[in-house]
């Protein structure tokens, strides 16, 4: 197999000489969840005042809609701290929700009409109004239902000691180039092998029929009352039905280097869309979208993984990358895990540690658009029918195929080696245990999250009943939780500080909204 590497063992040996490397990974989690009411319907209330400003609270914000909460952990180097902080955020949030609960799945609860989905509001400042207008554009382009599918994003970075082990001493410019090159190698391998993530952790094999709202689909759904499902699906969220973007299929953004990526991204932001132009940009004094290009802003680019750098104030994501190179990567392919109150488990985090480290240490040849399309087709197969035993996946574009099971076992042969090294560094066997558990799932699709969830839905009679049962139990667990890493005082201080920050931003505005937008998009001219 050309794609499963030649140099992995040699690189692993280099890194393993400093066991501290494996204790210093940087991790952060962003978890989305819909607020819902007693009857299992989407909440139509505004963002709770007790959570502060969604615009400036660093831990608790909103995504597309007022009802779509997003929790953001600080960067942590310890898995227990990471998940403990996420627990604490859930606890505090639930204390501010009254009778409302947090929906425990990726696919939304019952939504009668799109009119029930209120766009997220962030205040009266120009930057806040721009965030809401961007969402107005998404609503008009793709519909609101697509935007309230929830996910979990996993942010990950290697410590400086990792790069020291592989490359020795370097100048600042050399190190920046080394990191970017390696992270893009990781990204290419993620496209090649990352279908393992929806296979194991996809948890959206079914949806409420209200989600379609009369739209046609070519997927051969089966019905269980008002629940639609695909018997072998893993992640409808990652399918064409979910949050992907067919309008972006014309884009050719490459991942062979940071320069190639930024060039493709810049072109996408400047490419006009005849389809989106029909929507209008400003009609009768009211904005309908930020602009009529294929992407309004960079965030609109759909991707299962993104190269990232923390931006300075006023800096666009691409400008941050151009300035300092890749700092970390954001994994965006995780469905909400419905079997835990916080949407992600320790086993998942350990697998991601292993998989992302393996992807970075493995050989990663350049990838043209043809090869990228072939790998994307593998992803499409896995999300729609990944639990079909013996499903054949393509190996690149040369016609060779291999079963999902055979390919996964080849990857795990190297993941096991890595797990042993990482366990040795930590003085336990937790990575090996996670590896062993998931390797059993390869030959037993019924153990995957999507299979477990579909079984539960069939037992309960519907997705709605299952979501309400789990969500009700998690509400009680969240309320009973005791702070482990944050404190009530810290959470309340952040709420108060967020309100002050929002007010300061609003008072600092010096131009009207039209001028603000013109200045923001001046770089497109």
From Swiss-Prot:
EC number: 6.3.2.2
GO MF, one example: ATP binding
BP-aspect Gene Ontology terms: glutathione biosynthetic process
Catalytic reaction list: L-cysteine + L-glutamate + ATP = gamma-L-glutamyl-L-cysteine + ADP + phosphate + H(+)
InterPro entries, per the entry: Gln_synth/guanido_kin_cat_dom (IPR014746), Glu_cys_ligase (IPR007370), Glut_cys_ligase (IPR006334)
Pathway where this protein functions: Sulfur metabolism; glutathione biosynthesis; glutathione from L-cysteine and L-glutamate: step 1/2
Keywords: ATP-binding, Glutathione biosynthesis, Ligase, Nucleotide-binding
Entry's Gene Ontology cellular component terms: cytosol
Keyword Ligase on entry: yes
NCBIfam families, per the entry: glu_cys_ligase
HAMAP family linked: Glu_cys_ligase
Record-stated family: Belongs to the glutamate--cysteine ligase type 1 family. Type 1 subfamily.
Protein name per Swiss-Prot or TrEMBL: Glutamate--cysteine ligase
Species of origin: Vibrio vulnificus (strain CMCP6)
High-level lineage: Bacteria, Pseudomonadati, Pseudomonadota, Gammaproteobacteria, Vibrionales
Protein's gene: gshA
